[in-house]
């Protein structure tokens, strides 16, 4: 972390909060945690700047942090069993407020071993609890910093559509700006309009977002073109090449994709639709099945991913998840490749391809844009599906053409842009009309 930041620099805006006052508040909370001998707290903050302050306080006091993905009953129980209390915006306003102000701001140790427990949402199966340390998170943030083309400086405002409760949000929305000296936008902005509005809070802005949101950007919006936008960072899935290139060309802003996971942290980056470049602290290779393994400075051991890849000297090309490379007949079909091809169709806003829950065939769950909905209504379902299959046959084997189709206006992706298996299965098992 940048311990030498100007004390009058800002940590956030609207309202402004100076770095010196931010550190003082962190010291007060740390002192209170030590006084009460608190071993573990769970976080649930709306304000990311308050989250950052409470996080530094916990690092300084050695208090474990629990990050639930949501506050559903099972996570409430997890918090009750493993944390002394839930730390939120309301509690922050008065917790430790009576503690004395330190004469000198503390030096925050980037080698600190305080634990962060991240609980996954379980969207792809059983929820997992992953343990990180403060040292590992700082190391990862430094590697991210070295991989990005953006400068340090207090004039840059980091605006985000992702939650701080997940690893992606924690790394990029909290840890990275603390290293870079950027200001942290307080509120998560899940829609393009909010990101645009918040971007005007500072001389320059950088967005942390996802392919799902970036595909919804209206590149003809005059206000978007007026944004003091330096660039965007996208993760949580593959950004369609035409979308990324259109943003780069029309907004004259860098669009950087990050590849990684909660288990591995950041792995690699790319600034176009080409090969992935691992961080300077990351080594990669392939196992016997052709799936990528990762060994980074912040990992306790080598992590095996489920993503197929091809290596090209010090870079690599992703082929899609091994479990999403399925054999239909005698052909190996990449479900991710079908998605990428289908996303190029002018009617398609979003899509997810998986094996049908009953029949051994690809099934396509497709969100249509306005042109797509209009064409669906004009052509009728059968002719509409035929057109999409005809489009795909240019790039796909016949066995890779989806046999089953469901059409909606929006896919129910979670905050990490993932589709849950139960949602997908329900869409194809339920006998109902397309939701258009």
Where are these regions (language model features)?
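Conserved C-terminal "lid"/linker of ANL adenylate-forming enzymes
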Residues: 326, 353, 388-436
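Conserved AMP-binding A3 loop
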Residues: 18, 107, 115-142
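Conserved AMP-binding/adenylate-forming core of the ANL superfamily
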Residues: 4-35, 90, 132-135
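Conserved pre-ATP/AMP-binding loop-to-beta segment of ANL
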Residues: 2-6, 101-119, 151-159
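Gly/Ser/Thr-rich phosphate-binding loop
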Residues: 219-274
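AMP-binding/adenylate-forming catalytic core of the ANL superfamily
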Residues: 306-400
């Amino acid at each position: 972390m940048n311990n030498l930041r100007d004390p009058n620099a800002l940590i956030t805006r609207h309202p402004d909060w100076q770095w010196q006052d931010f550190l003082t508040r962190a010291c007060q909370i740390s002192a209170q945690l030590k006084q009460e001998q608190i071993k573990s707290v769970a976080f649930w903050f709306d304000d990311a700047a308050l989250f950052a302050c409470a996080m530094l306080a916990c690092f300084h006091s050695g208090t474990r942090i629990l990050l639930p993905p949501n506050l559903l009953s099972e996570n409430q129980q997890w918090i009750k069993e493993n944390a002394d209390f839930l730390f939120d915006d309301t509690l922050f306003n008065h917790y430790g407020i009576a503690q004395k102000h330190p004469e000198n701001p503390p030096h925050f140790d980037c080698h600190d071993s305080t634990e962060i427990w991240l609980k996954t949402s379980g969207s792809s199966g059983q929820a997992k609890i992953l343990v990180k340390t403060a040292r590992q998170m700082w190391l990862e943030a430094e590697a991210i910093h070295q991989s990005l083309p953006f400068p340090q400086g207090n004039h840059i405002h980091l605006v985000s559509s992702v939650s701080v409760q997940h690893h992606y949000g924690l790394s990029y929305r909290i840890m990275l700006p603390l290293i870079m000296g950027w200001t942290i936008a307080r509120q998560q902005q899940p829609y393009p309009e909010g990101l645009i509005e918040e971007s005007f809070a500072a001389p320059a802005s950088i967005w942390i977002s996802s392919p799902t949101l970036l595909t919804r950007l209206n590149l003809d919006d005059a206000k978007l073109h007026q944004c003091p936008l330096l660039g965007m960072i996208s993760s949580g899935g593959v950004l369609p090449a035409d979308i990324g290139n259109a943003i780069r060309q029309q907004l004259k802003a860098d669009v950087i994709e990050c590849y990684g996971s909660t288990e591995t942290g950041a792995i690699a980056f790319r600034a176009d639709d080409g090969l992935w470049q691992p961080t300077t602290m990351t080594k990669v290779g392939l196992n016997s099945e052709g799936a990528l393994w990762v060994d980074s400075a912040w990992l306790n051991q080598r992590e095996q991913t489920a993503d197929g890849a091809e290596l090209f000297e010090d870079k690599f090309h992703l082929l899609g998840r091994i479990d999403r490379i399925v054999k239909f007949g005698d052909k190996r079909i990449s479900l991710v490749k079908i998605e990428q091809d289908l996303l190029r169709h002018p009617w398609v806003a979003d899509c997810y391809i998986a094996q049908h829950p009953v029949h051994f065939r690809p099934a396509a769950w497709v969100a249509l844009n306005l042109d797509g909905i209009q064409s669906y209504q004009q052509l009728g379902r059968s002719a509409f599906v035929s057109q999409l299959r005809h489009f795909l046959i240019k790039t796909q084997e016949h066995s890779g053409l989806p046999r089953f189709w469901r059409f909606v206006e929006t896919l129910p992706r979670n905050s990490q842009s993932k589709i849950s298996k139960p949602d997908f299965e329900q869409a194809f098992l339920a006998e109902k009309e397309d939701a258009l």
